[in-house]
Amino acid sequence: MRSSAVVDSGPLIALFDRDDAHHARVVQFLGSHPGLHLCSTWAVLNETSAVLSSRVGKQAEIDFLEWVERGGVRVVAQDSTALPRMRALIAKYRDLPFDFADASVAVLAELASIEQVLTLDRDFEVYRDARGRPLKNILSAKRARSR
């Protein structure tokens, strides 16, 4: 059975921006986890596309979208029923850099019962799901240093 993780925009941006400080780390991580099934949200894809387009250029954005089309990441649509939980999380973590895309990642993980996230945001270690369980950041700096 393949393991799943919800991916945030940071690793996706790093994957397609060779000048990103985390590019090599993300490429190495994904290369060493070929069975990892990535899923994400439209909010994350929007954020990733916008950053790639402005920071790297249109070709990087196009390459990213083609990768998504080929199954690099499965996009899970969230409807308006997810909004109250996203709003509640944004309010709860108002003192942290927790935005709409981050909330969409946390809510997707919660609703799909996925405990693993792939993010460069260290704050994800503090977030808790509705049952009080932490999300496990499998790309955390602690794991990278312990290798």
What residue ranges belong to the model's regions?
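Amphipathic alpha-helical segments within well-ordered protein domains
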Residues: 13, 46-49, 87
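Short, well-structured N-terminal submotif of metal-dependent ribonuclease cores
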Residues: 1-40, 53-65, 143-146
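Active-site neighborhoods of divalent-metal-dependent phosphate/nucleic-acid chemistry enzymes
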Residues: 75-117, 122
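Short secondary-structure transition/capping segments
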Residues: 51, 88, 128-132
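General small-molecule cofactor/ligand-binding pocket signal
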Residues: 39, 76, 138
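Acidic, PIN/NYN-like endoribonuclease modules and their adjacent C-terminal/linker elements
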Residues: 2-4, 111-147
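Short, hinge-like loop/turn segments at secondary-structure boundaries
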Residues: 55-59, 94, 133-137
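Alpha-helix/helix-capping structural signal
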Residues: 10-11, 43, 81, 122-123
